[in-house]
Amino acid sequence: MFFHKKDPIHTVKIDEPNPRFAQLLLEQFGGATGELTAALQYWTQSFHCENAGIRDMLQDIALEEFGHLEMVGRMIEAHTKNVDQTEAYKSTLFAVRGVGPHLLDSQGNTWTASYVNEGGDVVRDLRANIAAEAGARQTYEELIKLSTDEGSKKTLVHLLTREISHTQMFMKALDSLGKLTDPMFGNIQPDN
């Protein structure tokens, strides 16, 4: 069902490795609004969705998020692997765990499935996804501001751009259901 294509959609090229920046990147690898969370959230939601078009969209975006996870992982690896290990170990997380990506956020908290937000209702899930993409975008914007490496910035801008595209896709799906601006979902109407 899956094929790992060796040619990335966007080439990750780091000009100036910085292990401390790699620690910040862990937020998008093993953090609550990171790529692993998004991929698993959208993939799981797809099995609850009876609308074939929206199910396919959720699975397509989930697979793209796995590609983003790979890009972030390669960035973390490049920022930690090819530098003086004294520098890498100045970052506490890499001193304890070793170089490269880990299922941790930037503060060392372990990734948990409780980050995955799925509820079995397509409208609820699409709204949760729009919020999740907003969290990812905010994190990418902050990482771009903090990065001093042009190669890192290019990859982060690419990832930010794709998150915006995902938000637009989720909004279009909600609109197709007539629920983009409707605050209600479900079948029970509130009392007057």
Q: What are the functions of these language-model segments?
A:
Residues 1-192:
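Non-heme di-metal
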